[in-house]
Amino acid sequence: AFGDAAAPADPALADTLLALVLAGTKTATCWDARDGLKGSAVGDCWVVLDGARTPRAVLRTVALEKCRFDQVSAEFAWLEGEDDRSLAAWRDGHRQFFEGDGHFAPDMWLWCERFELVAVL
């Protein structure tokens, strides 16, 4: 799945996010800071799996910062590349995602990561 070696809860979402990465539209991602750094550090490379858990791309982390959900910038929302790329759409989509994951608060902390595509597998 996108950035996660575990079986994706939503294979279609994993495939959608991967397609955005491969098109060059998605160059950032974020996750609940309570999940830790997941081994990420600037300069590290990681493999992206598709919804069937097949390795499809290698990415390199170029920036990583901790940020509150309600302080995520319009620039970061644009870099995530999802929906219409607006901050409003980003907030709505990610609020729904985190609520579905069992935890959401406007002031929750996120790890916000920017990456570059190194290789297509």
Predicted regions and their residues:
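Mixed-charge, low-complexity intrinsically disordered regions
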Residues: 1-60, 64-121
